Amino acid sequence: VTSNRRSNTELSYTFHGRDVYAYTGAKLASGHISFEEVGPELPVDKILELPVVETIIEDNLVRGAIDILDVRFGSLWTSITRDDFYALEPNFGDRFEVTIFNNDMLVYQNQVTYGKSFADVRIGQPIIYINSLYRVGLAINQGSFAKAYNVGVGSNWHIEIKRLGD
């Protein structure tokens, strides 16, 4: 759909939300193009649904998926909402056991502090925080969590956050 893409972005393949989807949506909403001009109709049986990992909350544990890697900083963004995490009744400064699996393989397990900002832990230390999407994030202060522990994203990457005894 080359004609429905922001001009001078033909060689850019990383910002389709901006260059293709938003641009085409704006043209469609403003009446500059019709549905037929967006592109060919896709058969319903060709639509692929991706699995969604459900968040599970148990007594002192919350489980979810690692959905997004913030590539600029190496932070992990999870499917666990702020409200789901709050079921563990966290206070800033509390420590939690964080366990990460790739399918069934253990990739990471350690105690991590819950903080307001990265400054709540020493440089090089991991931190649990609430990101701008109100989801649980996991990072290293001034480092890349993803690179340090070779963590990826997707429905096969699972995270467990367990409240430690007081």
Task: Explain the meaning of each model-derived region.
Residues 26, 94, 100, 164-165:
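Short acidic/glycine-rich loops and adjacent helix/strand connectors
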Residues 65, 97-99, 158-160:
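Ser/Thr- (and often Asn-) enriched beta-sheet segments in non-cytosolic proteins
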Residues 1-7, 56, 96-98:
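A short, terminal or domain-edge coil/loop segment
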